[in-house]
UniProtKB/Swiss-Prot annotation:
PANTHER family: UPF0125 PROTEIN RATB. Coiled coil: none annotated. It comes from Sodalis glossinidius (strain morsitans). Pfam families: Ub-RnfH. The lineage of its organism: Bacteria, Pseudomonadati, Pseudomonadota, Gammaproteobacteria, Enterobacterales. This is Protein RnfH. The gene is rnfH. Belongs to the UPF0125 (RnfH) family. SUPFAM superfamilies: MoaD/ThiS. InterPro entries: Mopterin_synth/thiamin_S_b, RnfH, RnfH_sf. It comes from the Bacteria.
Length: 94
């Protein structure tokens, strides 16, 4: 089987993690994340909680990767975006 090149990224406010990998064609998001070593490096990543995506589009751990894909591990939201907009609007009105 030919190989594919992918990137796995995880971004924090103070630091970004970027791993470039060469995997077998047919590899999944989950396999790429495990191969990146980020799970061992960052104890706060929990694949049962953190959502994942490919190029900013939501994806499933079992989705198959293509050559050149960027796998993204998302941090949990601290506050609902609608609630945040509501709070900002309230502050502006005062």
């Amino acid at each position: 089987m030919p190989d594919i090149r992918v990137e796995v990224v995880y971004a924090l406010p103070e630091r970004q993690y970027l791993r470039q990998l060469v995997l077998e064609e047919g590899s999944t998001l989950e396999q790429a994340i495990h191969a990146s070593g980020l799970l061992a490096l960052r104890q706060d990543i929990d694949l049962s909680v953190n959502k994942v995506g490919i190029f900013s589009r939501p994806a499933k751990l079992e989705d198959t990767l293509s050559d050149g894909d960027r796998v993204e591990i998302y941090r949990p939201l601290l506050i609902d975006p609608k609630e945040l907009r509501r709070q900002r609007a309230d502050r502006t009105r005062k």
